[in-house]
Design a protein with these regions (language model features):
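Short helix-adjacent coil turns
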Residues: 34-35, 122
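Conserved beta-strand-loop-alpha-helix junction that forms the acyl-donor binding cleft
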Residues: 115, 119, 144-154, 170-180
Length: 182
Protein backbone atom coordinates (compact mmCIF):
# COMPACT_ATOMS: atom_id res chain seq x y z
CA UNK A 1 0.00 0.00 0.00
CA UNK A 2 1.64 3.15 -1.13
CA UNK A 3 1.87 6.06 1.21
CA UNK A 4 2.10 4.03 4.40
CA UNK A 5 5.37 3.93 6.32
CA UNK A 6 7.11 0.55 6.19
CA UNK A 7 7.42 -1.84 9.08
CA UNK A 8 10.84 -1.74 10.77
CA UNK A 9 13.33 -4.14 9.23
CA UNK A 10 14.17 -7.01 11.55
CA UNK A 11 17.66 -8.44 11.80
CA UNK A 12 16.67 -11.52 13.78
CA UNK A 13 15.55 -14.79 12.23
CA UNK A 14 11.98 -14.35 13.28
CA UNK A 15 9.78 -15.09 16.24
CA UNK A 16 9.39 -18.51 17.75
CA UNK A 17 5.78 -19.65 17.55
CA UNK A 18 4.60 -20.75 21.01
CA UNK A 19 3.90 -24.52 21.07
CA UNK A 20 0.20 -24.09 21.97
CA UNK A 21 -0.27 -21.65 19.09
CA UNK A 22 1.45 -24.10 16.75
CA UNK A 23 -0.70 -26.97 18.06
CA UNK A 24 -3.78 -24.96 17.05
CA UNK A 25 -2.42 -24.80 13.48
CA UNK A 26 -1.08 -21.24 13.55
CA UNK A 27 2.37 -19.68 13.30
CA UNK A 28 3.91 -16.26 13.89
CA UNK A 29 6.17 -14.26 11.62
CA UNK A 30 7.28 -10.66 11.37
CA UNK A 31 4.87 -8.37 9.53
CA UNK A 32 6.09 -7.09 6.17
CA UNK A 33 4.93 -4.27 3.95
CA UNK A 34 3.30 -6.87 1.68
CA UNK A 35 0.94 -7.66 4.59
CA UNK A 36 -0.51 -4.15 4.72
CA UNK A 37 -3.53 -4.78 2.44
CA UNK A 38 -4.53 -7.85 4.47
CA UNK A 39 -3.89 -6.04 7.75
CA UNK A 40 -6.16 -3.25 6.52
CA UNK A 41 -8.87 -5.86 5.84
CA UNK A 42 -8.29 -7.36 9.30
CA UNK A 43 -8.76 -3.93 10.86
CA UNK A 44 -12.05 -3.49 8.98
CA UNK A 45 -13.16 -6.96 10.14
CA UNK A 46 -12.51 -6.10 13.79
CA UNK A 47 -14.66 -2.97 13.51
CA UNK A 48 -17.44 -4.45 11.35
CA UNK A 49 -20.05 -4.63 14.12
CA UNK A 50 -19.34 -1.09 15.24
CA UNK A 51 -19.55 0.39 11.74
CA UNK A 52 -22.61 -1.67 10.75
CA UNK A 53 -24.78 0.59 12.91
CA UNK A 54 -23.68 3.74 11.06
CA UNK A 55 -26.11 4.78 8.29
CA UNK A 56 -23.41 5.42 5.68
CA UNK A 57 -23.07 3.89 2.21
CA UNK A 58 -20.75 0.87 2.07
CA UNK A 59 -18.05 2.81 0.20
CA UNK A 60 -18.07 5.58 2.82
CA UNK A 61 -17.71 2.99 5.60
CA UNK A 62 -14.77 1.36 3.83
CA UNK A 63 -13.11 4.69 3.17
CA UNK A 64 -13.50 5.61 6.84
CA UNK A 65 -12.04 2.27 7.99
CA UNK A 66 -9.13 2.51 5.53
CA UNK A 67 -8.29 5.97 6.84
CA UNK A 68 -8.56 4.82 10.46
CA UNK A 69 -6.23 1.89 9.70
CA UNK A 70 -3.68 4.24 8.14
CA UNK A 71 -3.78 6.54 11.17
CA UNK A 72 -3.43 3.59 13.55
CA UNK A 73 -0.55 2.10 11.54
CA UNK A 74 1.34 5.39 11.58
CA UNK A 75 0.66 5.84 15.31
CA UNK A 76 1.96 2.36 16.14
CA UNK A 77 5.15 2.82 14.11
CA UNK A 78 5.90 6.20 15.71
CA UNK A 79 5.01 5.41 19.32
CA UNK A 80 5.97 1.71 19.45
CA UNK A 81 8.84 1.64 16.94
CA UNK A 82 10.71 -1.07 18.83
CA UNK A 83 7.70 -3.38 19.19
CA UNK A 84 7.51 -6.78 17.59
CA UNK A 85 5.00 -6.44 14.76
CA UNK A 86 3.89 -10.03 14.21
CA UNK A 87 1.27 -11.60 12.00
CA UNK A 88 -0.63 -14.76 12.86
CA UNK A 89 -0.90 -17.18 9.95
CA UNK A 90 -2.79 -20.38 9.31
CA UNK A 91 -1.99 -22.39 6.19
CA UNK A 92 -0.08 -19.40 4.81
CA UNK A 93 -3.01 -16.99 5.20
CA UNK A 94 -2.82 -13.96 7.47
CA UNK A 95 -5.46 -14.47 10.17
CA UNK A 96 -4.38 -11.93 12.75
CA UNK A 97 -1.77 -9.66 14.22
CA UNK A 98 0.05 -9.54 17.53
CA UNK A 99 2.04 -6.40 18.29
CA UNK A 100 4.08 -6.65 21.49
CA UNK A 101 6.48 -4.14 23.00
CA UNK A 102 8.92 -5.38 25.61
CA UNK A 103 9.50 -3.04 28.52
CA UNK A 104 11.78 -2.85 31.52
CA UNK A 105 8.96 -3.16 34.06
CA UNK A 106 6.06 -4.33 31.90
CA UNK A 107 5.47 -5.58 28.39
CA UNK A 108 2.73 -3.88 26.42
CA UNK A 109 0.33 -5.73 24.17
CA UNK A 110 -0.02 -2.95 21.61
CA UNK A 111 -2.58 -4.89 19.57
CA UNK A 112 -4.00 -8.37 19.28
CA UNK A 113 -6.55 -8.96 16.54
CA UNK A 114 -7.88 -12.05 14.81
CA UNK A 115 -10.33 -12.43 11.95
CA UNK A 116 -13.82 -13.35 13.13
CA UNK A 117 -13.48 -16.99 12.02
CA UNK A 118 -10.44 -17.45 14.29
CA UNK A 119 -11.79 -15.80 17.43
CA UNK A 120 -12.84 -17.98 20.35
CA UNK A 121 -10.54 -20.84 19.31
CA UNK A 122 -7.84 -20.30 21.93
CA UNK A 123 -5.30 -18.58 19.68
CA UNK A 124 -5.36 -15.24 21.49
CA UNK A 125 -5.26 -16.98 24.85
CA UNK A 126 -2.24 -19.06 23.79
CA UNK A 127 -0.39 -15.98 22.52
CA UNK A 128 -1.01 -14.02 25.70
CA UNK A 129 -0.17 -16.93 28.01
CA UNK A 130 3.15 -17.44 26.21
CA UNK A 131 3.90 -13.73 26.60
CA UNK A 132 2.94 -13.89 30.28
CA UNK A 133 5.35 -16.78 30.85
CA UNK A 134 8.15 -14.86 29.14
CA UNK A 135 7.39 -11.66 31.06
CA UNK A 136 7.21 -13.53 34.38
CA UNK A 137 10.57 -15.20 33.73
CA UNK A 138 12.07 -11.74 33.19
CA UNK A 139 10.31 -10.32 36.27
CA UNK A 140 8.02 -8.06 34.25
CA UNK A 141 4.28 -7.52 34.25
CA UNK A 142 2.06 -6.82 31.26
CA UNK A 143 -0.26 -4.02 30.20
CA UNK A 144 -2.88 -3.69 27.50
CA UNK A 145 -5.72 -1.40 26.47
CA UNK A 146 -9.09 -2.83 25.49
CA UNK A 147 -12.05 -1.18 23.84
CA UNK A 148 -14.63 -0.62 26.55
CA UNK A 149 -17.39 -2.17 24.41
CA UNK A 150 -15.38 -5.35 23.69
CA UNK A 151 -16.81 -7.41 26.53
CA UNK A 152 -15.56 -10.76 25.15
CA UNK A 153 -11.96 -9.54 25.09
CA UNK A 154 -12.26 -8.02 28.56
CA UNK A 155 -13.53 -11.33 29.94
CA UNK A 156 -10.64 -13.19 28.33
CA UNK A 157 -8.12 -10.77 29.81
CA UNK A 158 -9.73 -11.08 33.25
CA UNK A 159 -9.55 -14.90 33.02
CA UNK A 160 -5.84 -14.49 32.22
CA UNK A 161 -5.34 -12.44 35.40
CA UNK A 162 -5.45 -8.91 34.00
CA UNK A 163 -7.12 -6.36 36.25
CA UNK A 164 -8.63 -2.99 35.52
CA UNK A 165 -5.92 -0.41 36.14
CA UNK A 166 -7.35 2.79 34.69
CA UNK A 167 -10.71 4.02 33.48
CA UNK A 168 -10.67 7.62 32.31
CA UNK A 169 -14.16 7.39 30.86
CA UNK A 170 -12.82 7.14 27.30
CA UNK A 171 -13.24 4.41 24.72
CA UNK A 172 -10.47 2.18 26.13
CA UNK A 173 -9.69 0.66 29.51
CA UNK A 174 -6.16 -0.08 30.71
CA UNK A 175 -5.64 -3.51 32.20
CA UNK A 176 -2.50 -4.73 33.96
CA UNK A 177 -1.16 -8.15 34.82
CA UNK A 178 1.42 -8.78 37.53
CA UNK A 179 3.62 -11.84 37.45
CA UNK A 180 2.90 -14.23 40.33
CA UNK A 181 5.02 -13.29 43.31
CA UNK A 182 5.78 -9.83 41.96
Amino acid sequence: MSGLPPFPRRSDRGPVTPPRVEALGFRLRHATDEDLPRLRDLYADTRADEVAAVPWPAMAKRSFLDHQFELQHRHYLVHYADAQFLVVEQDGLLQGRYYLQRGTEADLIVDISLVAACRGRGVGRALIEASQREAATAGRGMTLHVVRANVAARRLYERLGFQLAADDGGTHLRMDWAAPGA
